A protein has these predicted regions:
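Bacterial N-terminal signal peptides
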Residues: 25-38
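Residue-level detector of functionally pivotal "anchor" positions at catalytic/ligand-binding pockets or at interdomain
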Residues: 295-328
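N-terminal module-boundary/linker segments of secreted carbohydrate-active enzymes
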Residues: 41-101, 290
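C-terminal tail/sorting-segment detector
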Residues: 337-347
Length: 347
């Protein structure tokens, strides 16, 4: 099984940018003009009360829909992970390490000395950002809790997500990294996840900003103030928001995320709208803030704002290409993971 996004490399297969542009515009125009689509019909009732809202008001409307959920105990999470984070081969799906093959139950918690020893419960949105109180619903919210390698989890600590300009620590094969931030607007130490999970974590953070909208201002007074703006909207500081939006665009919603969304819904009885509606973050924070959301007739932002194809791309360029859902499927090469003989292999 491969968890990576399809890519089209233009090397040695020359297609003129002009011809490619015409082809893609034709496809996207057909989509925008009303090809039959039932992709969002099943979620329409759940999100119906947010229909017609835009920007900040849309985020608040979504918050009212998703914030109430069945709160789990911390002990429940071990069993919950079996439903939410199980690889096709039955092993734990670890998003921090590419070398682990953890068995549910047998390898949970306990002492660890190195990467690959044990997995634990990771608050991808650090619990110290709200004071660590177990009384907060976020403490056990599965939409931001993941089973991860204990050693790499400790390497991250409560560092914010970011992109590193130089590596001070890293997991095996450089899958996850720690170092000074290269993103304009922040230069402190950050934790950079692997490319193929950046979109997953971006949508996790969009969910947190939405479900816990009323708490975000207070959370910014703690260590969370590195990424959080101290308000309900936009909720994130400019550097963090720009980065997360880019991550979501570069790493679109995957089958893994959709399956996990359904599994969490079966347990907590709420959903992540940014998975249900790919590109929804553009309606809240991005280029589609002036477009009214329609839960039953959702328009992917790519079909609204169009596409950009370089006029004279060099022969070795990665040209932006979108699929029929408006998801970018070619931009840069990403790390890949596959299951081979029962082992998770990075390539």
């Amino acid at each position: 099984m491969t968890h990576r996004h399809d890519s089209i490399r233009m090397n040695n297969h020359h297609i003129s940018a002009t011809a490619l542009g015409r082809m893609l515009r034709g496809v996207l125009c057909a989509v925008a003009l009303g090809l039959p689509c039932s992709l969002y019909a099943q979620q329409a009732t759940y999100y119906a009360s947010a229909t017609g809202e835009k920007g900040a008001a849309l985020k608040t409307a979504l918050s009212r829909i998703v914030r109430d959920h069945t709160v789990r105990t911390y002990a429940n999470l071990w069993d919950d992970f079996r439903e939410t984070d199980c690889r096709p081969d039955g092993k734990v799906w670890d998003m921090y390490s590419c070398i682990t093959d953890f068995t549910f139950g047998d390898d949970q918690a306990g002492n660890f000395r190195a990467e690959g020893d044990k997995y634990n419960r990771e608050h991808s949105f650090p619990k110290s950002w709200w004071g660590g109180s177990s009384g907060e619903a976020a403490y056990t919210d599965l939409f931001h809790l993941y089973p991860t390698d204990g050693y790499v989890n400790g390497m991250r600590g409560n560092l914010p997500f970011g992109e590193v300009k130089s590596v001070t620590k890293q997991s095996a094969q450089g899958f996850s990294k720690v170092g000074p931030c290269s993103v304009s607007g922040y230069s402190g130490t950050v934790f950079e996840p692997a490319d193929e999970y950046k979109g997953d974590f971006a949508r996790t953070y969009f969910y947190m900003a939405t479900a816990y909208e009323s708490s975000f201002a207070a959370w910014a007074e703690s260590e969370g103030g590195i990424m959080l703006a101290g308000n309900a909207w936009p909720g994130f500081k400019a550097w963090a928001l720009d980065m997360l939006l880019q991550w979501a665009e570069d790493d679109p919603v995957s089958e893994k995320e959709r399956d996990r969304n359904e599994a969490v819904y079966g347990i907590q009885h709420n959903r992540n709208p940014y998975i249900d509606y790919p590109g929804l973050e553009q309606y809240v924070w991005g280029e589609c803030q002036d477009v009214a959301f329609d839960a039953a007739d959702y328009k992917d932002p790519a079909t609204i704002v169009g596409i950009s194809v370089p006029v004279a791309a060099p022969s070795d360029a990665d040209v932006p290409v979108y699929d029929l859902q408006g998801r970018r499927i070619a931009r840069r090469h990403l790390h890949g993971i596959r299951i081979e003989n029962g082992k998770k292999v990075a390539h």
